[in-house]
Amino acid sequence: VTIVCNFSQPAEGQPALLSADEAGTLFHEFGHGLHNLFKDVHYYGVSGVPRDFVELPSQIMEHWVFEPEVLKVYAKHYQTGEVIPAALIEKLDKSGKYGQGFATTEYLAASLLDMDFHILKDVHDGADVMMFENAVLGERGLLEQIPPRYRTTYFNHTMGGGYTAGYYSYIWAEVLDCDAYEAYKE
């Protein structure tokens, strides 16, 4: 199992430090790594894990990235070793909730677009994918100011990588991971 990430390079002479977003990405990808590590299959491609479930292990890991007990283990000043202050932990928690409606709308728009691409019956020569995208989103009443997570011209998930007509699994996994996390917290 490997985890490959594309994090920001440090300025010359500076240490490589992760932003809060990059730490979240690392925990997310680590969740995928754990999921793959604990599968009991010889060949990865035939693991039998439904697409609806595949994001759950990675997304549940995102809950722990800013847990105070976890932060105290890894979020330390790189020079002094001082643990992240409680006030900053509280600010991180609040900032993670900011813009959640915007993010959910981005994912929903991308999920609807993905589904509509895969129920197309007639596609004529010279079809304009951006016109199709605008029509799909307009029919659903989505705001132009909140575009899909990925625009059609660079939405790799929808045409490959195992997420064809399954991009909604990110939103569904969020429902499942929040429920599982709350059960853990109880």
PLM region descriptions:
Residues 1-186:
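Cation-handling catalytic/transport regions enriched in His/Asp/Glu
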